């Protein structure tokens, strides 16, 4: 690896637990779900280093499942950095954020996991 390059140039998938309760504290009731989506985008941008962040429909449905005022306190997401196939794309990579399956034991102590691609 070259000095100063970083590891932002490879295709990778990771699972994270995002504490939305901490990020949405002191947020107006009627803005909680939209701000939760924005915070997930911001988290993926920081974790993967790509400006193009795409949120999956199932994740959006889960955030909005209890209405605008009641997004989940914590959510387990799978963030994948993928190569952009469009020729006219500004960015070489994009991030796709999907909802991950939650184990029966709960979310505590899971940490970050690197997922091996099946492709």
From Swiss-Prot:
One of its GO terms (cellular component) is cytosolic ribosome. SUPFAM superfamilies: Ribosomal protein L31e. The keyword Ribosomal protein applies. One of its GO terms (biological process) is translation. GO terms for molecular function: mRNA binding; structural constituent of ribosome. The keyword Ribonucleoprotein applies. InterPro entries: Ribosomal_eL31, Ribosomal_eL31_CS, Ribosomal_eL31_dom_sf. Keywords: Ribonucleoprotein, Ribosomal protein. Pfam families: Ribosomal_L31e (PF01198). NCBIfam families: PRK01192.1-1. This is Large ribosomal subunit protein eL31z. It comes from Arabidopsis thaliana.
């Amino acid at each position: 690896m070259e000095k100063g390059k970083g590891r932002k140039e490879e295709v990778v998938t990771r699972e994270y637990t995002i504490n939305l309760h901490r990020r949405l504290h002191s947020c107006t009731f009627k803005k909680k779900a939209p701000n939760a989506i924005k915070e997930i985008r911001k988290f993926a941008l920081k974790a993967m280093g790509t400006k193009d962040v795409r949120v999956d429909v199932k994740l959006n449905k889960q955030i909005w499942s209890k209405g605008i005022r009641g997004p989940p306190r914590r959510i387990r997401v799978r963030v994948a950095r993928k190569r952009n196939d469009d020729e006219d794309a500004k960015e070489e990579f994009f991030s796709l954020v999907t909802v991950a399956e939650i184990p029966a034991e709960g979310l505590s102590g899971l940490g970050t996991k690197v997922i091996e691609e099946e492709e």
